[in-house]
Amino acid sequence: MFTENQNNNQRHALKTEIKTVFNSDSGVTYFSILIETSSKMSLYNVIIKTFITQLQKANRECQIQIITYGDSVNTIFEFDSEPNELKDSLKEIKFSKDNEEAKLGEAMRMCFNNIESNWSSDLMSKIIIISSGQSTDDSSDDLVDILSLDNNSIYGLAGCNLANKSSDEAVKDLQSLLPDQKVIPLGKNPSQDIRLLMNGGGGAANGGGAANGASSSDEHSINCPVNIEVYPHTNETKSIKDDLLLDVVIKPDGNTASVPSGTKIKFLSNKYYSGYTIQLKQNLVFGEPYEETIKLEFKKGQMEKTQFENFPSKIIFHIELANDRDNVHEGFVALNISYFLGELKSKYRCCIGVEGEIGNGKSTCLNGFVNLFNPVGELEEYFNANRTSGTHVTTSINNTSLKEILSAKHYIHPVQESFHDIDIAWSDSWGFVDTDVQLRHKAEGRIHHGTKKDECTILQPDDRYRIDCFIFVVSIRNFTNPASMQRIEKKIKEVLQMNITPLLAITFSDTLSKNQLQDVMKNKVAELSVQESNTFIISNYTEKETHKDISKDVQYLRLLTKAVQLCKVKNEKDIMNKVKGISNLSINDNNNSFNQTPIKNQPFFESSSTSSPSPAFFRSPIQQQQQQTSTTSTQSPSPSSSSASTPPPPSQMLNEQPSKTINVTIDVVTDSSGTVLTSFEIESSTNESVSELKCKLINEIDPEMNANDWSITKESGTVLFESARLSSIIKSFDNSDSIKLVLKKKQKLF
């Protein structure tokens, strides 16, 4: 990891763009108007309806939704409704005479759902909340975060007709619900309120600010006089769940002498990160840039799938010049996925094999994986991708590791220096053919790099080519092909028989409608014995695409993160099995000692006429399995001779139940309030103890954590005995294949 000084010398700026948004927006703006209809707002009936009517007249091309909230929440006017129907809809706004309830939280969630289903992030969204400054439902916490979207602005109009509450108090109360958002009093002049809100003018005390400055703002509206450069705070790749630290450099452009004190650069919050505001404390002159490190906090508690779906492609910021409030200067910082790969770090080598029919996108998917580690914008091709149907482009096994790819480069980008803890290898293969060997040979490392399709020879096991996880890439078109589905199902069963969890990547899904895709996921995917949590929709890069798209990169990262997680689990399981094997070996030796049979000193694998264990017992599980299979096929020894020549398997010696793999969902809770810090899924064996599961979880979260400070509980709070096996615990769950537990920090007693 670079020190800060080294980092400053080698840092690379993220792509940043700034544009000026004129007050007369040429595009369609989506207005969401939330109206409190409690008795506290009844006197504003006419003012509110006039405000909405004039807002529509001032924005002819806008889309409007109106939601009322009191003791109930209702949408009285929807997006895409005919504009001439607005007048009749306004009659449905009814204010209560005595009810003071205001379910603002529920209204904002309804607003968010309506926006998300109708609105694109390329368009402008403006939310206007007309309120007395109260929220009476429990869901009112973090209201602004619910509506955190790119290109989205929130405004507040505060009023209250209670004799003991002034408009200033109402503004203060509403401002506490909408921190960092613009809130003004609801006045008697709707036109002025619209101008103040939409044009960035001051509050009621300086309401003429926007209009007064209009005549002198033309030169500022053409070009933004501020240059902004944004750098990652460190060149080390971080977890996608970490807070985002950015170094922001602000300076005047070449045509501007200075940037005035009081200028604000607001980095807007979104569904993934919190916001941040930089305010200049003094005038910024040319040649003396200002730099500040900002922290955008990761919003904890997101589920794994939602977490990746919410990850933003860019961070939106607004520039509010102290001497030009008439125009909004808007910009964005494009995020680079290579700085968010920390979840892929592992102390084990993770080898991932990709399988599927010809032309389904296997090699393209692998190229997507590798390009995650390419911080440059242009795509690179490491695996030969099939651009036609019916022709094998990949005709031999191609094993490539990240370390090999990076070592072949003449120049290493600074962030690539931090990939040393990421040890991933990929294995590309030809499309399924009838003469394919079983996948267990690939899992054992018996199919080596360079093996040709027509000369597939099973060789001695080599750890360099051992496959830890299999991803099946399936085109959406293949779900209607019975022969293809039969081959895929056969291969998936081969993986399941090895107690390896298969992953499914569905490609070319853009050829179906949303309803058609849901139908395939519900009816067809279920037939393949792959859990829904292990099924991924992947939008592969096409031949015409030459530059990276972070929305696609996030899909690749989510799939690769799951694959690496499964590889870690498998490697942990293999190590545990080896430890158990050695332990069982010691038990066997101790049992022999009671027979007082003399044992000669000899090398570990050397046979002895007086020693009962045969050399075969010390061989690898793969060799042992093959020998047992061969023996079974050639002879059928009597029970007495079999027990005398072959020691019992370790599981029988310890009287353990047959192991199976289950899916465990874990909520991490750090305080007594029960707030879930994060949630994730992990594969576990039923033969694992609660203690082993806890240690594995802590190793995944933070190896520096003290395991003694944590306990595993059920959702009800029941603490599980650490010596208990998962096989006994799952009996109390309705679904023994998938259970949910809690990793909870123990509370100290004083």
Curated annotation (Swiss-Prot):
CC per GO annotation: membrane raft
Annotated stretches, region: Disordered: 586-657
Compositionally biased region (Low complexity): 586-595, 603-645
Any one biological process term the GO annotation gives: cellular response to rapamycin
One Pfam short name: VWA
Superkingdom field: Eukaryota
InterPro entries: P-loop_NTPase (IPR027417), VWF_A (IPR002035), vWFA_dom_sf (IPR036465)
Domain VWFA: 17-249
PANTHER family named in the record: INTERFERON-INDUCED PROTEIN 44 (PTHR14241), VWFA DOMAIN-CONTAINING PROTEIN-RELATED (PTHR14241:SF32)
Name this polypeptide is given: von Willebrand factor A domain-containing protein DDB_G0292188
Source species: Dictyostelium discoideum
Lineage: Eukaryota, Amoebozoa, Evosea, Eumycetozoa, Dictyostelia
